[in-house]
Amino acid sequence: MPQEESRRAAVEAARTLLIEAGPQAVTLKAVAARIGRTHANLLHHFGSAAELQKALAVHLAATVCGSIGDAARAARAGIGSPREIVDLAFDAFDREGGAALATWMMLSGNEGALDPIVEAIHRLIDELHPQEQEHDAKLTMHETTQALVLLALGDALIGERLAKSLGVRRETVRERATAMLVTSYLEAGVMNPGAEP
């Protein structure tokens, strides 16, 4: 198997392990076993488990930001909705394991591995809202993105327990996030007032 194909297979296996068993399961040994390679082979490709996790973070950031970018463009065109964007963001941190991976990397002292995620989000927002890059521009969508990501991260970590404790539906946070996104879209002029939330 060519080197790039082997790396790609390892990252996909790492993503599957992350979703199935959490970030602590994403080890060179486990990924090697999953793709029928040796530990030494993966060590050659990545150098360490931390570098494998960083490659996984890059992969997650690219795929999630790609999906969110597509959903945002669809919402602008009137064939998608802000709720789809919110669901993609929340699911990336919850079901896809993004929050668990981010927390694990930070607790392991591998904070630098989060840079690809942060940078991918920044690039996406700059691409979708270039007007906010101008000097003295209002950063409506940048600020909304920060809030949306932090809501999604927090919900993935303690959302279910907190909702139960407060006696509210867990879905409430997604509804509030959608309302915030719609308000910001209207303020930024990227959505018609009559469009579907």
Task: Say what each PLM segment does.
Residues 87-122, 160:
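Amphipathic alpha-helical segments used for helix-helix packing
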Residues 150-157:
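Outer-membrane beta-barrel translocator/channel fold
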